[in-house]
Amino acid sequence: MNEGKRSISLIATVALLLGFPVPALASWQSWEPEFAAMIENTCLDCHDDLEQKGYFRLDNLAPMHADPSTAKIWLYVYDRVNKGEMPPKKRQFSDAERNRFTEFLGEQLKAFDAAQERSVGRVVSRRLSSNEYENAVRDLLHLPGLTAAQYTPADVEYHGLDNVADEQELAYSQIALYLEAAEASLQAAVALRPKPDVEPIRYAPRELGAHRKAYRNAHTLVNDELVLIKEPMKSQGPWGLFTAPEEPGYYKIRFRARTGRMAYSAFAEAEHAGDDVPEILPGDKNQTVALGVTLGRFFDSFNVTPESDTYESTVWLHGNERLRIHCADLPLRSARFASGKNPDIWDAFVIEWAEIEGPLIEQWPPKGHQALFGDLPMKEWSEESGCLPPRSIALGTGDVREVSKPTGELYYIHSKNPSRDSKRLLRSFMERAYRRPVRNSEVAVMQERVLEGLDRNLCFQDAMLIAYKAILCSPDFLFIAEEPGELSGGELAARLALYLWRSLPDERLSNLGRSGSLTKTDVLRAEALRMLDDPKADRFIDDFANQWLGLDDIYSTTPDKRLYPEYEEDSFLVESMVRETRRFVREMIRSDLPIANIVDSDFAFLNEHLARHYGVAGVEGGELRKVKLPSGSPRGGILTQASILKISSDGFTTSPVKRGVWVLERILGTPPPPPPPDAGSIEPDTRGAVTIRQQLEKHRRNESCANCHQGIDPPGFALESFDVMGGFRTQYRSLEGGEKETLLRGPLGYQIRTALSVDSSGEIAGRQFSDIYEFKRILEEEERQIARNILNRLLVHATGAVATFSDREVIEALLDANEADGYGMRSLILSILETPMFLRK
C-alpha cells in the first residue's frame, strides 16, 4: 500500500485507543481474510474516499443483506475482474489470484441471491408499467383504442426497460395521476346516451373546400372533383377529409380516387365549373396515399392507380379527431424542380368523393358499459327518480376529451336492488382487475363506498363509479401480487399474460390457472403458443421492440432542412421506418429466425418510400412487404435500418459515440460505464472543415476518456456511412464549405453542399474492418452474446427483474440448448417459461 494511503485497520486501532467509536466495517472486511487483503492492497489505492477513480468507491460498502443495492456493485466488480479489465496492468492479479477472487465473490453473490429469494423472492413487488396499465384498462373496459398511459406516472427506465421492479418508485403525489387515469378511462366506457346514428355520411369535394384559401395553389376544385398537385402543408400533408366525429370508436372510411395529371396554369382560379373546366389528364403512375390523424398515428396506406377505384379502411378514432389524408408522393409545396422551373404538367391526385360511417357498434350499450353495469336498464332521469342528476360524461378515448352537453334527456342506471346488484357487479369486475379470486371482505369494502354514495342520493351509476375508481387505484390492481416460492396457477396466469400480452389473462387462461393445470409444463407451453398466435401478442412484440431498440425516440429529432432538405418533415417516411423495424422483429418471432438476422439478413420489409430511400428498385405502394435485398446492399438486419440510424443521431450530424453506445447496449448488452462529469462533449462541425473522427481523436487524448472510447467508437465509425435519416452516403454535408451539388430525387432537385469523405473503417478487439460489410462479419461472430442480451431482456419482460448472478448458469444452459438452431427468437421466448426465474417469485 502506498505511504500516502491510510490503512483502515490502523484507523480503527487509533480510534479505539483515543476512545472514539470505531467506524462500521464495510461488507468485504468481514469476509475471508485473504479476500479482504486483496481488496485493501489492490483496489483501495484507486477506489477509496480519497481517490474514487472513476467515481467508484469500495471502502464504504455496506453488507449486501443490509443494503441489497450493493450486490449490483459487487456484481460489477466481479465482471470487471473476471474479464481482466481490473485491476489495472500495474497491479494485475495472477491467474490463480483472479480465480480465487472471483470464486469467493461468486459464492457471496449466490448466498445473497438465495437469501433474497427466501425472504422476498427473486423480484420485489412491482407495479404495472404505463403500457401494461393501459392495456389492462383497455381489456377491462373493452376499449381497444383507449389511451390512458399519458395519465400515469412516468416509468423509470433501466437500459430502456420500463418494468424493472427495483427501479420503480411510487410517491403519494403520484396517486393523483392514477385517479385521473381511472376517471378518464371509466368515463370513456359509460354510455348514458341514445345509440349514435351510424348512417354513412358522404362528402363531396365542394363541401370539403372550406379551407381552400389557406391551401392556395395546393389544390383546386374541378366540378365535383378535388385535384391536388402539391402537398397542401409544408410537406407530407395532412389534408383534412372530414369534420371530427364526437363519438369514439371504429369508423369505416371510403373514398373514390385516382391519379392524374394537370396543367399548372389551371390552378390560377380557386375552383372551376361550367364551361371553364380545365382538362384532368389521365395519370401515368401510381401514388401512395396514407390515412392518419396526427404525427405518429397513421392508420393505413393505399396504392392509388390511374383507374378510378374505391378505397376502404376501418380505423379507431378517439373522438374529436379529424381524419387526414397524406399524399406522400406529391412534391412539397416549397420543392424546387431539377430543371429550375415548374413543369407545365404536374402529377395530380384526384378525389371524387369521400365517406365516413360510424361509430360501428356491435351492441348498445357497448361492451365496456356492460362490464360496469351488466344488463341493468337505462332510464330517463327526472326529479321523481329520487336521485341527484347524473354527472356529465367526457366523451373520447384520446388526449382530447369533450364534456358531453346533453341536448335533451338525462339518463341514469336503474337498479331495483342496489345492494345485490352492486355486490354482483363489483365482484365480477374486481376478479378481472385483480387477476385472482376476491374475498367477500374485499367486495364488502368496495360496496360500502357504493352504499355511502346512495345514502347521499347519488344515482346508481355515480355511486358505482366511485368504487370502480377505487378499484383501478388499489394496490391489488396496480401491483403484481405474488408470494415467495413457487408461483400458484393463478399467479402463473397473471405473469404469463403480462409477459406475452402485456395485460390481463383472458377467461381461458384464468380458468387454467385456478384449476392448477397451468403449473404443468405441457399446458403452460401450449398456452404460450396460443397466446403468441393471438393478435394481442403484437402488444408484446411492439413493446419489446420499442424498449429494446429505443423506437419511442423516433420523433425526438428532426433533420436540419438546410443540410437535408430532401427529408423535410417527411412524416410518412419516418412512420415507415418504425413500421419496418416492428415488422422485422415480428417476423423473427413468428418464424423463429436465428438471432444472426439482427446483424444481417437477405430481406427487409419495405414500401415504395423506404425502397427509394434504400436504393432498392421494383417496390411500389405504401404497404410494407417482405423484399429480398439485392446483392451488395448495405441493408439487411436491424443494425442498418433507417429507424435505428435516426434514433442514434441528431438533426444536424451523426455521432459515432452515440451510435457506438447504442450497439454496445442494445445489440451486445455490454453498455459502457457512464462518462465522468468532466468528459465534455463534442460540438458538430457543420462547416465541413473537420470530420467527427478527427474531433474524437483529439478527445481521446484525455486519458480518462481513451479507455472507454476504444470500445465505443469503432461500432459508431462502421455506421458513419449512413446519415441522420439512415440514407447511405460517401461524403459529409456542410452549411458553408465544400462543393455545391444538386441532389436529384425523381423530378425534384435539392441544393446541398458536400464536404469531406466518410471513413467507416475501424478496429475492434484487435480486428480491423474497412466498412459496414466487414464490421457485420465481425459482429456476426458474437451471436451468442447477442442471444444472451436478448434472453436477459426477455427475462426482464417476463419477470420484472434483471438477471442476478445466480441466474447466469440457467441462462447459459438456455443458450446451450438453443445454439444448434441459431438461437431462434421464438424459441428463446418460450425457453424462459421452464426456468425457475419464471416459475418462482
Model-flagged regions — what are they?
Residues 9-23:
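Bacterial N-terminal signal peptides
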Residues 59-62, 87:
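Residue-level detector of conserved, well-ordered beta-strand and adjacent loop positions
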Residues 53-55, 88:
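Short secondary-structure junction motifs
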Residues 1-6:
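N-terminal secretory signal peptides that target proteins for export/translocation
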Residues 29-52, 69-76, 81-82, 93-841:
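Low-complexity, glycine/serine/threonine/alanine-rich intrinsically disordered linker
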Residues 64-67:
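Acidic-and-aromatic substrate-binding clefts and catalytic sites of carbohydrate-active enzymes
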